[in-house]
């Protein structure tokens, strides 16, 4: 799959399931710090493409779509994972936490 193509729906669903079930706290962290929604109380990954990860955040009891861009286009699951880890680490640094994922 090359840049400019979207991921297969099954792949997006698998990645979203893992992010939402295993890393829900990271979703909120990413949305608060990198997604411009510091008041988010919850966030679920809702999709992705080669350019960004998408979330549905809860802000003041309202569902808000949030798109957080990758540092570079991604073309496979390993790159998505690396970008998710980068996002979490960058978000932690923004909050003064230097511990890496």
Task: Label every PLM stretch briefly.
Residues 1-101:
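Binding-site signature for planar aromatic cofactors or substrates
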């Amino acid at each position: 799959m090359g840049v400019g193509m979207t991921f297969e729906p099954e792949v997006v669903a698998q990645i979203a399931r893992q992010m939402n079930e295993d890393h829900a706290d990271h979703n909120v962290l990413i949305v608060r710090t990198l997604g411009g929604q510091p008041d988010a109380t919850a966030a679920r990954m809702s999709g992705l493409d080669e350019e960004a990860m998408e979330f549905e955040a809860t802000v003041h009891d309202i569902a808000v779509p949030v798109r957080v861009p990758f540092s570079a286009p991604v073309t496979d699951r390993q790159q998505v994972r690396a970008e998710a880890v980068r996002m979490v680490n960058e978000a932690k640094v923004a909050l003064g936490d230097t511990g890496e994922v």
